Regions:
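Phosphate/NTP-binding elements of NTP-utilizing enzymes
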Residues: 2-367
């Protein structure tokens, strides 16, 4: 991105418009400073957490000096990557530090940087003031801002991690990282070694889980295991969403197959405390009043871990009906069922504990 002297002067003039106040939160700054366009989202405009309020607390971990490790074990369509992008943008603008974004492969890292990360910066005036005058200092993999640096690396190229002291590490989709070999050390281990030069370092781990022994599930277990609780619109008690509480009407077409249209229309959530019927609109409203609650009192101080299934997503592909149909289609095969459990429920796969025989009107699945 080439900036003329006039553009640079105008950006300097606007600096105070985006300068954070001491009491400004990460979320406040992001919502005032970042813009998403059609290149990143189907809902372009100013960055906002209003539809996905569960992203707010994890975002504040970027500023919280008592937190040094954050794990997001989240399902699909939950905005975990956008949440990380907003937090990293805040860091670059407000606490300039060397940072590393580690992804499964270098080609994926390059594509992500080019198609999602850099467009967000270029569309946000507050971030343009962090750009250097020399355009060649910002590439897809190496980005030297005016006061900070960011490097994108693939886990399949661990040699690129050598001699890179960083204060902040983002390890994205860690369960898809390349395994260590006799010739190459584990990329995640190497990346974490790079944090030792900074006493205020932070590490953010994200992924949908795969198996119990996988990286993200083990990281979640060692943290304080936070889960998002919502108020039931009927009894007002706080509950965490569980797949077994999703139900639908038994509906078959003339050929004996599932009538997916009727199933999608009838699916709803049943409160596990009062048995009240919770609709999709109820869920969206309840999200605004949700609370993250830690469930592991034995976690080390400063080690946060958040679990969030796609049940919480307000996305149209995560309605009760859409997920019910996805489940019925997926359970026809073990591979499909594992994909549903990992991707939508954000739970690890344990084949020996899976019960494939279920009633046709229940979402019961034991993992």
């Amino acid at each position: 991105l080439n900036l003329t002297d006039l553009q640079r002067s105008l950006l300097d003039y606007r600096r105070n418009l985006y300068r954070p106040t001491p009491m400004q939160t990460v979320v406040d700054w992001a919502e005032a400073s970042l813009r998403l366009t059609q290149r990143q989202t189907e809902h372009p405009g100013p960055f906002s957490t209003s539809v996905r309020p569960y992203t707010r607390e994890p975002m504040e971990c970027w500023k919280d000096p008592t937190v040094y490790e954050v794990t997001l074990c989240w399902g699909s369509q939950t905005s975990k990557t956008t949440t990380l992008m907003a937090g990293l943008a805040w860091l670059i603008a407000n606490e300039p530090s060397p940072a590393l974004w580690l992804m499964p492969t270098e080609s994926l890292a390059r594509s992500f940087s080019k198609s999602r990360w850099l467009p967000m910066l270029e569309d946000s005036p507050a971030m343009l003031e962090c750009y250097p005058a020399e355009a060649d200092k910002i590439t897809n993999l190496e980005q030297n801002f005016t006061r900070s640096t960011l490097t994108f690396v693939g886990s399949n190229s661990p040699a690129n991690l050598a001699s890179r002291p960083v204060r902040v590490l983002i390890a994205d989709e860690v369960d898809k990282f390349a395994e260590a070999t006799a010739r190459e050390a584990d990329a995640l281990d190497l990346a974490e070694q790079r944090l030792k030069s900074f006493s205020s370092s932070k590490a953010f781990m994200t992924s949908t889980p795969t198996v119990v022994e996988g990286r993200i599930w083990q990281r979640f277990l060692r943290g304080d295991q936070r889960r998002y609780y919502l108020p039931c619109p009927h009894c007002r008690e706080y509950i965490k969403l569980e797949w077994r509480q999703v139900t639908w009407d038994d509906a078959k077409a003339e050929d004996g197959k599932h009538d997916l249209g009727k199933i999608r229309a009838s699916a709803h959530y049943v409160c596990q405390l009062c048995q009240g019927k919770i609709t999709d609109s109820h869920k969206v409203a309840a999200l605004r009043h949700g609370q993250w609650r830690p469930e592991n009192p034995n976690a080390m101080p400063g080690v946060r871990s958040y679990h969030l299934s796609s049940l919480y997503s307000p996305d149209r592909k995560c309605t009760w009906g859409y997920l019910a149909v996805s489940f019925l289609e997926a359970k026809a095969s073990m591979a499909g069922l594992q994909g549903f459990i990992n991707g939508n429920l954000a739970e690890p796969w344990e084949q020996q504990d899976v019960q494939q025989e279920r009633t046709e009107t229940s979402a019961t699945v034991t993992v």
